[in-house]
Amino acid sequence: MSRLATKSLKGLRLRPSLPSTSPASPWLAATRLRRYASNEHKGNFKGQMVQSITQRLEREKADLERLGNLGEKKAVGINWSITASKSPFPPPSLPSSPSPAPSDPPPVVLMFGGMTYFLGTTRPHDPDPSSTLPLSATVPPRHKTGKASLEAAWADFVDIVGEANVSTLPDNLHAHSTSEWSSHPADPSQRPFCVVYPSTTDEVSLIMKVCHARRIPVVGYSGGTSLEGHFTPTRGGISIDFAHMNQIVALHKEDLDVVVQPAVGWESLNEELAEHNLFFPPDPGPGAMIGGMVGTGCSGTNAYRYGTMREWVLSLTVVLADGTVIKTRQRPRKSSAGYDLTKLFIGSEGTLGLVTEATLKVTVKPASSSVAVASFGSIREAADCVARVVGDGVPVAAVEILDDDQMRFINAAGATTRQWKEAPTIFFKFSGTAAGVKEQVALVRGLAKANGGLSFDFARSEDEMTELWSARKEALWSTMAVKKPGEHVWTGDVAVPMSRLPDIIEETKRDLKSSGLTSSIVGHVGDGNFHIILVYSDKERVLAEDCVHRMVKRAIEMEGTVTVCFLR
């Protein structure tokens, strides 16, 4: 018996069984097995423990012996050709004959053994884990967008939502294919055949079942404020517009969460939450709705302190491609049960399913808040100031940058109530207690001055705060206002590690200036993110493409990422 078994038995104050060589050993073992397996002693814990340990050790010993025998067999199989001449059982010699002298193995045996060894060492033992199927060889999705198929589907949609909620008007189809700032509007052949307006999750499910059965592609649509072509169709099919699904389903104030439908705008949601001293932090562009915000995993000016959309979604109700309805999880904040399906759907842009309901986290509004604006002599100085604020751990709520061209566009558009210094400008937002906000403002003022700040203004009232922050929210629309008829707007979204932010902003600004295109830089630089906005004519299309291509390359070289609608 092994030492472990003996030690275990001693711990139980039982005498170990006799060795297996003892004549009494089989009888004792059988007696003990019968004793502890009987109903009379079924509850005897010590007996069950002895039996369990003994059986386990016997199984382990048998496994080790079997493994050892298997290893010996493999070794003999591999080396048989080399050791064949040294058999441990040579044929006995005749008494009258002298013992034969040892001789070298035959050449054929040596040759065969060498070939076996060579093949055994060169042949891979495990399959190559890498994919051997090139992307070009994969089978693309096959859709049926012929006239007969789409017209038959139209009749099915009318049965589901009513004829008034299925539109084939050309203007409506165009609006669901492109936007004023889309750099790649859909070709007429790629526009949706119709736009369907469901009102419930069940209707969305029925619509998707029809499309799945008829192999019709689908694009979801909510606010239509995307800047990088997220809702632009490429295969025709249909567009599902969630305009009728715009209700706040339930507010759980005590739990700090709210259940909403996809066409609820973040601005209208915050108006409702403000009545309860609550707010929903993600704040992308004006007009954005929850469905699109989930689909794109949006950011916003509050992302520096509060994070992006990913941090504020608890659960989703999703309709899959075949019409199956799933709920990704329940409402509790903490859950480690199963896969994190919620995060999987956030940022998937409708490619995995259509969101018909979202449970969002909300938080209590800060007791105090303020806004400050600092201007600088160069874009590099402004970016360096941001890096210092972040590096020093100043707990500001938001950090936004607008370059000199963007400030000039805002003045020209007259979208705000004041004239701004046309210089690279940083907009800071502060929140917390009154004392905390005051301390943050003082720290940022000092850092701005140390990094070449030309001016520093901060809001002393709610009206001043609204006025100062209005310039940031009007950035895109101000640029749209300066473009001439026939010109287009192209936007790009770049993010890099914070340590590379000053470099990429400076190099991008220099490149934009040298291109001669009307352009600006604006963004949520607190987390290393900024946008470029290009205005170009049809003649300048190639020039704009080259500029965007260099920006993409620059971001990748700096270990960053880019979201841009870019086709070569």
Language model regions located:
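N-terminal flexible segment immediately upstream of the FAD-binding catalytic core
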Residues: 2-5, 22-209, 226-256, 406-415, ...
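C-terminal substrate-recognition/cap domain of FAD-linked oxidoreductases
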Residues: 98-102, 170-177, 364, 370, ...
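Short, ordered loop/turn segments at secondary-structure junctions
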Residues: 222-225, 285, 401-404, 567
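FAD-binding subdomain of flavoenzyme oxidoreductases
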Residues: 247-254, 258-400
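Short acidic/histidine-rich active-site segments
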Residues: 524, 560-568
